[in-house]
Curated annotation (Swiss-Prot):
One of its GO terms (molecular function) is RNA-DNA hybrid ribonuclease activity. Belongs to the RNase HII family. The gene is rnhB. This is Ribonuclease HII. Its EC number is 3.1.26.4. The lineage of its organism: Bacteria, Bacillati, Bacillota, Bacilli, Lactobacillales. It comes from the Bacteria. One of its GO terms (biological process) is mismatch repair. PANTHER family: RIBONUCLEASE H2 SUBUNIT A, RIBONUCLEASE HII. Endonuclease that specifically degrades the RNA of RNA-DNA hybrids. Signal peptide: none annotated. Its main location: cytoplasm.
Length: 253
């Protein structure tokens, strides 16, 4: 009779819930075997659910693949709402039908997984571009226009020319064909990839600023108006990276 350890190893090779080998092991009365069967089936179902989710997030890309358009850049930004720091945009071109496990809107992914998924994107992407507009630009032309500038810069920094742009809720002044997608980071893998790249990039920038301007907890709040950040403003005043066109900073000038 096979040991529980040996059976567990065999179960790991089964990837189909309809595999006939399940019947052989389900008659084994040992609790350890039954527990292993339940866990393996749970893992397989989880993988199937993830595959279906990723497939659904390729709907916009697949419409373009049918038209023989394969170099598709997903574009997203992070940092429109904070009181301090830049707005950061990313443009990412993934290979056709590329499915990176657990890739999703950055807001739906636990922060502890951001770096791993970010690295997977960098490893698999055909091209990645970053665009950054600082607080001075935001104050000069407003956050909406600064966001568009950052997105255009991100596209210009791609090492591969995109044939089509998938953009999260924006239309850019570019001649490249584009599709505006509401909640794009939750509905397109290309945009979700850009969301993660922009998020990790901006978080690193704000973490570095925490060393330059201590007392505002930038590494924790990324420039958003948390209690700790607002207390820092009252105690230490405005820094060069604060957005002077945003309240409450505007009223502090």
């Amino acid at each position: 009779m096979a040991t529980i350890k040996e059976i567990k190893a065999i179960l790991e090779t089964i990837v189909d819930l309809k595999d006939k080998r399940w019947q052989e092991y389900q008659t084994d009365s040992r609790a350890g075997v039954q527990k292993a069967i339940l866990q393996r089936k749970k893992n397989i179902q989880s993988d199937l659910d993830e595959e279906a989710r990723l497939e659904q997030m390729l709907v916009y890309e697949k419409k373009l693949y049918i038209e023989h358009i394969n170099l598709i850049a997903g574009i997203d930004e992070v940092g429109r709402g904070p009181l301090a720091g830049p707005v950061v945009a990313a443009a990412v071109i993934l290979p056709p039908n590329c499915k990176i496990k657990h890739l999703n809107d950055s807001k739906k992914i636990p922060k502890k997984k951001h770096q791993e998924i970010y690295q997977n994107i960098l490893d698999q992407a055909l091209a990645v571009g970053i665009g950054i507009q600082d607080s001075q630009c935001i104050d000069d032309i407003n956050i909406y226009e600064a966001t568009k500038h950052a997105m255009i810069d991100a596209v210009s920094h791609l090492s591969v020319a995109p044939e089509h742009l998938l953009i999260d809720a924006m239309v850019l002044d570019l001649s490249i064909p584009q599709t505006k997608i509401i909640k794009g980071d939750a509905n397109s893998l290309s945009i979700a990839a850009a969301s993660i790249v922009a998020k990790v990039t901006r978080d690193k920038i704000m973490s570095d600023y925490d060393s330059t301007y201590p007392g505002y907890a930038f590494s924790k709040n990324a420039g958003y108006g948390t209690k700790e950040h607002l207390e820092g403003l009252q105690k230490y005043g405005i820094t060069p990276i604060h957005r002077k066109s945003f309240e409450p900073i505007k009223s502090m000038l």
